[in-house]
Amino acid sequence: DDYMILDFARENQDVKNNFVENMNDLDTFFRNLFLLKGKRLKGKNCVIIFDEVQLFPQARQAIKYLVADGRYEYIETGSLISIRKNVKDILIPSEEYRIKMYPMDFEEYLWAINDEEVTIPTIREAFEKRKPLGDAIHRRIMKSFRTYMVVGGMPQAVDAYVSGKSYEQIDFVKRNILSLYEEDLAKYDTENREKASVIYRTIPEQLENKNSHFKLSMVDKNARYQNYMDAVSFISEAMIGNECINVTKPEVALELFADRSNFKLYMGDTGLLVTQIMKNRDSTDEDLYKALIIDNLGINQ
């Protein structure tokens, strides 16, 4: 019915003090919160969003009491590595359920550009009936798919595309996302040397060489898997990259047959891959993006 966002990167100290001072009296807590935010939640199904919750761990700890209170639903968002690290002196609430958030897929991208009623039903019908679309329709759909691949599925990038921004402006948005990724990787690397950052930077090169598996020798000629496995796991768990692990037998319990030392890494988003490849350029111009849409996107498939 309604929602409220508490962005702890921007909230003033009075809002934060309310969490510290009034958890034992939730009537007072909500009264103060609504007064400080200038808004009262109305309706039976309302949600309060704790954005950048890693910046204020006390709010995360308060979830235990707020959920038990039952008045509202709660969503927490934030940087995975900082959420993991900023837990000193707080009790991590068992009421938390982690939900993985993925980039928008092709169907969701089509929803965003108001094409939810044409392309996907056409593809689905052709697939179910095993009926070809014809060259003209196939070309039209593939152009839309290639556009999705270069824009990618990050909501900010898709929003920029839908808003009519140029490809150069969309590329700027994606460069900013990559910079945020690099900051998270750097935080990890402060305790683990420069392992995750180097691995992440080599993903496009690894894919371009079409190796059957990720070659750690391209990271460091003396590298051993056991010295880098935690960094690889972090990249995968943070969903900055997608880890594909070899299995020795195609059985139901794949985990029993996983050969974790034999793996490949892919970028988590094709649009970010395109921008990562072009990162040595100051910006990526319109003509280059249009050329990519036409014929040059095999690297992340």
Please name every model-derived segment.
Residues Y3-K44:
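Short glycine-rich substrate-engagement loop in P-loop NTPases that contacts/grips substrate
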Residues D159-Q301:
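Accessory nucleic acid-recognition modules appended to NTPase machines
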Residues R40-A59:
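Conserved P-loop NTPase "ATPase switch" module shared by AAA+ and STAND
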Residues K16-F19, V53-I63, N86-V87:
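Conserved ATPase-coupling elements of RecA-like P-loop NTPase cores
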Residues N86-E208:
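Interdomain motor-coupling "hinge/lid" segment immediately C-terminal to the ATP-binding subdomain
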Residues A68-D89:
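Sensor-1/coupling segment of RecA-like P-loop NTPase cores
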Residues A9-Q13, L80-R84, P103-E107, T248, ...:
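Conserved nucleotide-binding/hydrolysis micro-motifs of P-loop NTPases
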Residues I49-D51, E73-S79, K100, Y109:
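Structural recognition of the conserved hydrophobic beta-strand(s) that form the central parallel beta-sheet
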